[in-house]
Amino acid sequence: MELLFTPHPLIEAPTDEEILLLGESDPKALEELYRAREGLIKASQDDPLRHGFDLAGWDRIRQGLMEYNEVLALGGNRSGKTTGCAKLVMEAVTKNQDGHIVCFSQNADTSVKVQQASIWEMMPKEFKKKTKSIEGYINFSMQNGFTGSSFIFPDTRTRVDFKTYTQFSNNQTILEGFEFGFKNNPDLNIGSWLDEYLGDAALVNTLRFRLATRNSKMLLGFTPIDGFTPFVAEYQRDARTLATKPAELLGGVEVPVVQYAPARDAS
């Protein structure tokens, strides 16, 4: 039986020469290697929250959330910002009790198709069916996202709400009375996630008050294709570089990958 190793960017497959040599010397070991590797790939696809692979930038975001109240993740299109943020949010949801997280997207369409879809991708597979109980409710469709733009994770009784920047612009009182984050102040205490934030400081400043009582953190994502907005530029003002990395496409020039923003006390 011919063994076809699935291509994967992170799990290296044996070369044709190695396959031939091992197949001749120890066919059973080759088959075990094949099954183990294919099993890792399938597990990462079926349950990326618990068995998936982290990009280096995600670990930097996670570390920033441990040290600062706000983390701004910058990156180009298809750099994995949204997926990484969704994984961190779901880590907080599944590990910590009785929390409340609010997630913002540009509009209803991007909320369903991008932000809610990325959260659903990270949902543990045993909850990827309609779940309804006293302590939890999950109902999702690709067409409409989460029913009521919200879900409650049963095992932790943590609620996640999805809202849009348009909603806040039309009514800046929609967050009145809420506290976001987790009361027990865990290590990964995320209270809000703002994806592709293009607005001014109004929403961020409002959320700061809603996060303060639970000492929870704010996660923001932004794609600087056409430069920085005035609000994002505030983070960049007098920023101190904490870590650099050689840029392959720039001839190995060292570029910042982690910075500290004193203007916002953020990473």
Give the label of every model feature segment:
Residues E2-S267:
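Phosphate/NTP-binding elements of NTP-utilizing enzymes
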